[in-house]
Amino acid sequence: MIDYGLKNKVALITGANNPWGIGATTAMAFAREGAKVVLVYKKVDRPFDATKTGKNGVDRYYAANAGDASDVEEKLKKMGADYLVLESDISNEDAVKEIYSTVLAKYGRVDILVNNAATDDENGFDTIEKITQKVIDDTFAVNVRGSLMMTREFINQRGDYGRIINLSTDAAQVFAGQITYGASKATLEALTRSIALEVAQYGITVNCVAPGPTQTGWIDEDFEKVVTPLIPMGKLIQPQDIAETILFLASEQARMITGQVIKVSGGKAI
C-alpha cells in the first residue's frame, strides 16, 4: 500500500454532506491515511420524493444534499478518525473567515484544501435562451467566489505544507444545457493555473480534478444506460476514483505537479 505521507496532516474539504458524494468519500480516504479531516457543508433544499430515495436518482441526491453530515460523521467515528464538522456557507466572506478561525483554533493549521462544494441550476434555466441573473449569481457565488475565498484564506494562513485541489468537470469547456455551470468550472480551471504560478514560491501546489459522469447517487438506471456508452472504459466513474486522485495530488509524491487539470473520466474527455 502506498504511503502518501498524510498522517496528521489537516485536510479541509468543502461540500461533504452527501454520503455517496466525492467530498465524503475523499474525507474518508484522508482519514484512512491518518489525516485530520475538516468537513464543511451547506444544506441545499430542493424538492424530492422521499419514497424514491432508496435507490440512485435525483431524489436520493437531493435528499442527501438537503441533510446534514451525520451519516458521514458516523462513518468517520467508526474509523476512529480525528475530525471536525462545520455547517457553513462558503459564498459568504465572513463565514469563510469563521471557518478558518475555528479550524485554526482546533488544529493550528490547514495543510490541504479540497474545493469540492458546487451548485448548479436544476430547473432548466441554465441555457442561453432562459438564463437568469439569479442562476448566474448563485452559480458563480459558490463555484468561483466561494472557492476563491477559501483559497485566499488558505494561502494567507499557510504553514510549511500546502496542497490545493479544486474540483471541476470533464465538460467545463463545452457544457450545452448548463452553460453557467460549465463556465464556472472553466473559470476555476483558469484560476487553478494562475494561482499555481502565484503561490509556487511558497512551495504550495494547486491542481484541479475534472471528473466525468460520477455515481454520487444521482445517476439512475435509465440515465446510466445512456451515459455509459459515452465512456470508452465502459463504466461510470466512482467517487473513490476521484478521492484516490485527490490523495495523490495532496501527497509529498506530487510535490512537483502544479497548475494541472487531471481528467478522471474513463476516456470520455481527453
What do the predicted segments below correspond to?
Residues A200, T205, I257-G259:
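Short, small/polar-rich loop/turn modules that mediate ligand/substrate recognition or access, typified
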Residues P19-G21, T119-D120, R163-T187, T192-Q201, ...:
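Catalytic loop of short-chain dehydrogenase/reductase
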Residues G124-I128, T132-D137, V227:
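Substrate-binding pocket helix/loop in short-chain dehydrogenase/reductase
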Residues A63-G67, E87-I99, Q133, Q240-D241:
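The beta1-alpha1 cofactor-binding region of Rossmann-like NAD(H)/NADP(H)-dependent oxidoreductases
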Residues F125, K225, P229, M233, ...:
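Short C-terminal tail/terminal secondary-structure segment
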Residues I231-I242, Q253:
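A conserved structural motif in NAD(P)-dependent oxidoreductases
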Residues Y4-V40, V44:
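Canonical Rossmann dinucleotide-binding motif of NAD(H)/NADP(H)-dependent dehydrogenases/reductases
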